[in-house]
């Protein structure tokens, strides 16, 4: 099973709590995180894109770096780990993304890929005057389908004459092309999102579910597997989890309860309000899971809370789910969390037993 880190491009990572570590996103922090992840044989690093935060006492995600420029910098200071940036496709023409991706492919030596998102948070785009209207909620995957076709043209032949409802290319050129086939990833959980991933993505992200229920996402992975079978492609699921680990189950649980007790209710209220704006995409979208009150303090990603041995066991359970090819991990404290994962959790995981021994220390 592949292991990735979801780098904290926004302030405070993924805990919406006054009791959680409070920090600003910086290049130096993310460099330290990704270099440490590479040292511990993580397979990939991904950054999201967020253009407006949730506010509240913690000013959650009000402070964000930009994904492509951050990952270009990280590509230059790593050597093995795969690097993925996220394109907010309403903000960037596909021909520009194609060229930026080809550039980072050159920087990284063929280790770069692109995560495509349609955009769900209306205020991110309204503030710039580029929100296309609420009809976009029901047409966003039509838009993304045209977008990725332009990308594939330009990365493949270096030329596109694509004509569609949203994009018109007229002998559009990009050169040089990427040195290896460019991977495209997506995070669709709605039927439309999975249908898109089945046709165009190399793999699809989905949310884990619940606290210490590592296989609860299995129906989502099964839906993705079924959608991919209909297109004759192999599109695996990569599952998002937060790891909160300590020496004992009780110590880890105490940290989790402490974070929940400090939940930033103002920021969470804003998230809930935004989740209700899209009335056209159905009930199975990512944002509706994020806003579910069950575990909103970490946007309802699956949460693994326990001793190092307990977390290792639960991750092996994740690996046993058909269609699950990897996990994307966040941590309550990224630097110590990755070190503890590499030193204390990963060596206990049967699904990572193939890894070579560590040979050097990392700062």
From Swiss-Prot:
* EC primary class: oxidoreductase
Q: Biological process (GO) annotations?
A: alkanesulfonate catabolic process; nitrogen utilization; uracil catabolic process
SUPFAM superfamilies in the cross-refs: Bacterial luciferase-like
- The EC number(s) given in the record are 1.14.99.46
Q: Which GO terms describe its molecular function?
A: alkanesulfonate monooxygenase activity; uracil oxygenase activity
Instruction: Provide this UniProt record's keywords sorted from A to Z.
Output: Flavoprotein, FMN, Monooxygenase, NADP, Oxidoreductase
Question: Any idea what job this protein has?
Answer: The FMN-N(5)-oxide reacts spontaneously with NADH to produce FMN. Requires the flavin reductase RutF to regenerate FMN in vivo.
- Protein family per UniProt: Belongs to the NtaA/SnaA/DszA monooxygenase family. RutA subfamily.
NCBIfam families (UniProt xref): RutA
Q: Which HAMAP family does the entry mention?
A: RutA
Q: What is this protein called?
A: Pyrimidine monooxygenase RutA
Organism, scientific name: Escherichia coli O127:H6 (strain E2348/69 / EPEC)
Q: What gene name is listed for this protein?
A: rutA
């Amino acid at each position: 099973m592949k292991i990735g880190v979801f780098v904290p491009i926004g302030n405070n990572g993924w805990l919406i709590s006054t009791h959680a570590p409070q920090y600003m996103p910086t290049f130096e922090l993310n460099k330290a995180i990704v270099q440490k992840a590479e040292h511990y044989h993580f397979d990939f690093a991904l950054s999201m894109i967020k253009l407006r935060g949730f506010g509240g006492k913690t000013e959650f995600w009000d402070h964000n770096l930009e994904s492509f420029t951050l990952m270009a910098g990280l590509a230059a200071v790593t050597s093995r780990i795969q690097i993925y940036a996220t394109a907010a496709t309403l903000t960037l023409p596909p021909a520009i993304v194609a060229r930026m991706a080809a550039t980072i492919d050159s920087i990284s030596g063929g280790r770069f890929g692109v995560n495509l998102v349609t955009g769900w948070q209306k205020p991110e785009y309204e503030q710039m005057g580029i929100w296309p209207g609420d009809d976009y909620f029901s047409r966003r995957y039509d838009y993304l389908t045209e977008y990725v076709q332009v990308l594939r043209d330009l990365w493949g032949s270096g030329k596109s004459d694509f004509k569609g409802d949203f994009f018109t290319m007229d002998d559009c050129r990009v050169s040089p092309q990427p040195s290896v086939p460019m991977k495209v990833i997506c995070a669709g959980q709605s039927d439309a999102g999975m249908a898109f991933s089945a046709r165009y993505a190399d793999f699809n992200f989905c949310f884990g579910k619940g606290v210490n229920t590592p296989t609860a996402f299995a129906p989502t992975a099964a839906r993705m597997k079924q959608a991919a079978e209909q297109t004759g492609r192999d599109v695996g699921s990569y599952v998002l989890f937060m790891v909160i680990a300590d020496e004992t189950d009780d110590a880890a649980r105490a940290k989790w309860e402490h974070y929940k007790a400090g939940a930033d209710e103002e920021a969470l209220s804003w998230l809930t309000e935004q989740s209700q704006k899209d009335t056209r995409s159905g009930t199975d979208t990512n944002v509706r899971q994020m806003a579910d009150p069950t575990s909103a303090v970490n946007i309802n990603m699956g949460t693994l809370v326990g001793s190092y041995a307990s977390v290792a066991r639960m991750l092996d359970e994740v690996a046993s789910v058909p269609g699950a090819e990897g996990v994307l991990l966040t941590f309550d404290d990224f630097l110590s969390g990755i070190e503890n994962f590499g030193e204390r959790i990963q060596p206990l995981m049967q699904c990572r037993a193939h890894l070579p021994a560590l040979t050097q220390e990392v700062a």
